């Protein structure tokens, strides 16, 4: 069974940077050693946003974007190696999630698409890469997401305490770690995605730092109720979603009914949308004693305060409190999934994704020996 140093690479739907994590992994433990966040050039970020919202590209443009993202991921890995004074031979493999540009797990031909050419990463780093983690699960009838609950269960499940892990990235997803029950998990809806899109359009800021804008505004209750009527929120699990659904166009359609509103009030309403949709799903799933939050949203003081207020009797904390950086959780999970793939172990949980069976995930892109 392969063990040793692995690197996880994650570029999520929030597009706030490429997260790279170095960890030692074996069958008994996952020990994080180092991490860094690598910036995404504005031009690449905009290209990804455009394609996620349905803008048409030529095949040439699409191929260029795939290559550019692969090179970006390789640069991020090389920066971490240099920082840690490590060589390619010191790393067993890289687990690279890729950049999701479309996720459509239902319909006549279910599919999901993550780009960022893994061949570029292998060629530029000299390290074996495991990628394309989601499509095997979809081929077996699953949603292909979320995949991280399996990792949450391995690291954070408790024999007696009802726990849930909440990742608030661009999309928010919940892992249900309830003693005596199969692991559950699904996307609750927008996390930071709509908040980030709104403040970017209104103020040119990538995100609402310390929720300053949201805290300066007031929740527009009719707008909140209008958004909460979206059918996704009442859809039963398993379910997953992404930027192809909850995007700026989605927000604009709801705002048409509310002309002339204060932009800060919209920001406050979007924060409340995220908090309410998450808390409702926690309660519908039977509640928990401890809700451990990770992802960029765990650094949003307003979101954390609202979750605590909406979930009385639940200890709302970050995963930092149990020794795992909330900023690095997803990248660490894909390092772990790469280890499982090389070990020939399944990486999905049918109780979460709805797949017909457990399966080894991903494709292996071997480095030259």
Curated annotation (Swiss-Prot):
EC category name? transferase
> What pathway or pathways are given for this protein in its record?
Amino-sugar metabolism; 1,6-anhydro-N-acetylmuramate degradation; Cell wall biogenesis; peptidoglycan recycling
One GO MF term on file is: kinase activity
| Reactions accelerated catalytically | 1,6-anhydro-N-acetyl-beta-muramate + ATP + H2O = N-acetyl-D-muramate 6-phosphate + ADP + H(+)
Cite the SUPFAM superfamilies for this sequence: Actin-like ATPase domain (SSF53067)
Q: Which Gene3D superfamilies match?
A: 3.30.420.40
> Which amino acid positions bind ATP, per UniProt?
12-19
| Gene Ontology biological process | 1,6-anhydro-N-acetyl-beta-muramic acid catabolic process; amino sugar metabolic process; peptidoglycan turnover
Q: What is its EC number?
A: 2.7.1.170
Keywords for this protein: ATP-binding, Carbohydrate metabolism, Kinase, Nucleotide-binding, Transferase
Look up keyword Nucleotide-binding and say if it applies.
yes
Q: Which NCBIfam families match?
A: PRK09585.1-1 (NF007138), PRK09585.1-3 (NF007139), PRK09585.3-2 (NF007148)
Family membership, please give it: Belongs to the anhydro-N-acetylmuramic acid kinase family.
| Role noted for this protein | Catalyzes the specific phosphorylation of 1,6-anhydro-N-acetylmuramic acid (anhMurNAc) with the simultaneous cleavage of the 1,6-anhydro ring, generating MurNAc-6-P. Is required for the utilization of anhMurNAc either imported from the medium or derived from its own cell wall murein, and thus plays a role in cell wall recycling.
HAMAP family per the record?
A: AnhMurNAc_kinase
Protein name in the entry: Anhydro-N-acetylmuramic acid kinase
From which organism does this entry originate? Escherichia coli O157:H7
